[in-house]
């Protein structure tokens, strides 16, 4: 006698326990019931492009091409045959080796700061960097107790002294030493252009009117510390003392994270980098060694002298080349080690020596901050770069450096012929991303053709994908997004209740990982399905 069970709907059938009895329909004895499936999957990535632009593209729109890896993984699913030829399942898929690489040589900078693209048949021309000459920006260094006390004690030139010299000085001229201290030790100009009237008379720097007076943490914690009065007068010793103490407190509260030696080294390195292409034309060697963080007082002094000599040699090389007053003024930095540092350096204690090094380095940084001689040299060098003869020499030098780099690269290749192919490939490529993905989907399948032992089926699915891994060799936060898929496969009846599914599928991601990459894999899988 035939057993007939009516199925109210496909979804209600999914609620049947996996131990439910099979459903026999018709003379063929076709069974409906739960099944489990396990398999392996592999494929390729489609629809993903590099986030990096191709520097050879003049319009700046083309992205670099990627070399993609072949993702692989496994699948695990549970489902139900809900009607003859129709199945519904819930499955999980894990994919790894979702990788992409860009050729390392596609984006690189050569020794003269040129960014270029690898050429194919000589079609891609190098993109040359335009050398911009801008003096290093001033860096405000912490004001030490010794420098603070020195500033407080700076006297004004008295009215009597100016009268005895037949000079009638105003208050600012009498306070010239104090104004110089503000510039050299605090990096502040006493007078600046009026922002409301740039062509009008200069006004007292508003910064000076906003410097809290005295200790930033006064005893008793008053609600607010006083600022200099609106009628601030630099020759007034009481107001000057409060200003210096306030500046020293603020400079130490907002001091740079790097040590004074590191700040000095970076400034000198920038200057050397700025002038190197012109020094090469003049045949002047530019040192490539920076100050160590543990530089001694003597090393700092020698570095400042080296900088002075190099700038003067460069100026002298081009003196008279442009005519006029260009390169006419000698470079004399005249770095003098602070007296306080000299006294500290004479001690034998390590702490005293470290303090002396910091004091000397800070003094050197202050000397370079807004240095008029260096600023004028930069202006002259900017004019020099526009000269036709110098332009031609720069192009010739760049071409020579390109040739040297090419020859060096060929020599390196010959030396590396003994290395393994795998190692070579590793050096030729640069990872763009390396990801793994866990996908959970609900899928519906329908047979489109059935024979005694084989059936061809199609299916659709939707679900969520969780992606993690690295982009540009940096770990990313896990990304979750919607996905949809379509599949076409063949089911082979290998034994009673056992089927082998060979399936091809495509999965589409609706969102981008890190707003850069849309991972759309094209996959092939082999699974074993067992009907209970």
Swiss-Prot record:
SUPFAM superfamilies according to UniProt: OMPA-like
Main location group: membrane
One GO CC term, this protein: plasma membrane
Subcellular location: Cell membrane
Bias kind Basic and acidic residues: ranges: 403-413
Region feature (Disordered): 401-428
Topology of the protein relative to the lipid bilayer: Multi-pass membrane protein
Residues that span the membrane, as ranges: 67-87, 480-500
Annotated disulfide bonds: none
Coiled-coil annotated residue ranges, if any: none
Keywords, alphabetical: Cell membrane, Membrane, Signal, Transmembrane, Transmembrane helix, Virulence
Leader sequence segment: 1-22
NCBIfam families associated with the record: Orientia_TSA56
Task performed by this protein: May be an adherent factor for rickettsial adsorption to the host-cell surface and a determinant of virulence of individual rickettsial strain. It is the major outer membrane protein.
The protein's name in its UniProt record: 56 kDa type-specific antigen
Classification of source organism: Bacteria, Pseudomonadati, Pseudomonadota, Alphaproteobacteria, Rickettsiales
